[in-house]
């Protein structure tokens, strides 16, 4: 809960926060040390959303959060659909981190693309179908955004700091 406390303090002071949820185990993945299963990244987003809804930052503006997930994460479809219910994750903007590998898969007829976590392939999907789902969701719900993450990191002057994503608000960038 230390990160949630840090997030609350940042938002209380008027700041915005970006999170990369790609490093959280996919839903249903085994957690050996606990002999349990992961609830997945989207469930963790709910915790941070509750913090954001609770904190009114400097004045009446609520905190701003951006949740990102790599396009190759096994829970990417759940992430894309997470905000279709207007009552869910209202303290978040969400964006998909699109990789060069995904864009290359879109250029092929088969569109084969692997969803992976910690070098384990969970599923091979059709990149064309996933791209269509991203675009339809963006058209219908105005989310997710698309971040060409490899290009961003390639052009990043602070590449050695491993910066992955940016702030949800242009003035906080």
Describe the predicted segments one by one:
Residues 1-53:
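Long, structured ligand/cofactor-binding scaffold of large enzymes
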Residues 24, 33-47, 57-160:
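Conserved, charged catalytic cores of large soluble enzymes
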Residues 165-170:
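Conserved small/polar residues in nucleotide/adenosyl-binding loops
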Residues 173:
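Extended, polar beta-sheet/loop recognition surfaces of beta-rich domains
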């Amino acid at each position: 809960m230390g990160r949630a406390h840090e997030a609350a303090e940042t938002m209380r002071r008027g700041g915005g926060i970006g999170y990369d949820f790609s490093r959280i185990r996919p839903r249903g993945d085994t957690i050996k040390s606990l002999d349990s299963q992961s609830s997945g990244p989207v469930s963790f987003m709910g915790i941070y959303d509750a913090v954001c809804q609770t904190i009114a930052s400097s004045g009446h503006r609520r905190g701003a959060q951006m949740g990102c997930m790599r396009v190759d994460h096994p829970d990417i479809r759940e992430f894309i659909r997470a905000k279709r219910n207007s009552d869910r994750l209202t303290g978040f903007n969400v964006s998909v981190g699109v990789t060069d590998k995904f864009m290359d898969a879109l250029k092929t007829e088969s569109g084969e693309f692997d969803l992976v976590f910690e070098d384990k392939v969970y599923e091979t999907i059709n990149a064309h179908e996933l791209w269509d789902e991203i675009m339809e969701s963006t058209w219908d719900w105005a989310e997710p955004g698309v971040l060409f993450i490899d290009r961003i990191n390639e052009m990043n002057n602070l590449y050695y700091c491993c910066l992955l994503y940016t702030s949800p608000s242009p003035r906080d960038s």
